[in-house]
From Swiss-Prot:
Gene3D superfamilies: Nucleoside diphosphate kinase-like domain (3.30.70.141). Its main location: cytoplasm. This is Nucleoside diphosphate kinase. It comes from Methanoculleus marisnigri (strain ATCC 35101 / DSM 1498 / JR1). The gene is ndk. Major role in the synthesis of nucleoside triphosphates other than ATP. The ATP gamma phosphate is transferred to the NDP beta phosphate via a ping-pong mechanism, using a phosphorylated active-site intermediate. It is found in: Cytoplasm. Keywords: ATP-binding, Cytoplasm, Kinase, Magnesium, Metal-binding, Nucleotide metabolism, Nucleotide-binding, Phosphoprotein, Transferase.
Length: 149
């Protein structure tokens, strides 16, 4: 089964959206295999967003991510990276579909509530940044036989 990394950013945590976001993914049939609430240190923020290091918005992004706790999650499911990205919505909330997480809860591209890996390769890299090997749990959901062929 595939895995992906999802992070509720400080604005989402501070607005009390963690439960709503977890509920949406669970209702879809995805399996939560790791979760923790953390104040991210600078080194991990830089590693997480390394593709943006030279962009003019990076200092603000780094300060924002470090401004409060983030809720880090590992999710598992068939095609989970694409499923989660669709549920999260476009990076720019103005372009996010109504009903998506960003479409419903975000107003500003700089405070867009949530991060989700954009490819299986990014998911593996980001999970490795934020979770140690023993922190992810293998188990079966009782409804898996109903969800998957």
């Amino acid at each position: 089964m595939d895995r992906t990394f999802v992070m509720v950013k400080p604005d989402g945590v501070q607005r009390g959206l963690v439960g709503e976001i977890v509920s949406r993914f669970e209702a879809k049939g995805l399996k939560l295999v790791g979760a923790k609430l953390e104040l991210l240190p600078e080194g991990r923020v830089v590693e997480q967003y390394r593709e943006h290091l030279e962009k003019p918005f990076f200092p603000g992004l780094k300060a924002y991510i470090m401004s409060g706790p983030c809720f880090l999650m590992a999710w598992e499911g068939k095609g989970v990276v694409a499923v989660v990205r669709r549920m999260v919505g476009a990076t720019n909330p103005a372009e996010a579909a109504p009903g998506s997480i960003r479409g419903n809860f975000a107003l500003d591209i700089g405070r867009n509530v949530i991060h989700a890996s954009d490819s299986p390769e990014s998911a593996a890299r980001e999970l490795g940044i934020h979770f140690a090997a023993g922190e992810l749990v293998d188990y079966s959901r009782i409804d898996e036989p109903v969800l998957y062929e």
